[in-house]
């Protein structure tokens, strides 16, 4: 899993996302089919959505300024850590 995530995120976003997850900043994680939504508490509360496709993440969105510029952010990484820590049918 780590090698896969290293292709999705830069190391700083991955490390910060892991820290957000470990500090319990991922809240209201929900699954509807292959779509996940969550709120991540950062400098503000950011909405994160991701679509899971067979064996990979299809698309990810976040309301933070960094993601709005087309980047994959620490909030997205935090949600992936949260998903991987739970038993979801994907």
Model-inferred region functions:
Residues 1-90:
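Long, low-complexity, compositionally biased intrinsically disordered regions
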């Amino acid at each position: 899993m780590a090698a896969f995530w290293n292709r999705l995120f830069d190391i700083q976003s991955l490390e910060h996302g892991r820290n957000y997850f470990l500090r319990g900043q991922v809240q209201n994680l929900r699954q509807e089919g292959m779509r996940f939504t969550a709120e991540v508490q950062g400098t503000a509360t950011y909405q994160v959505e991701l679509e899971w496709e067979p064996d990979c993440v299809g698309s990810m969105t976040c309301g933070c300024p960094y993601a709005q510029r087309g980047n994959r952010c620490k909030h997205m990484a935090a949600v992936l850590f949260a998903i991987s820590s739970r038993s979801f049918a994907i």
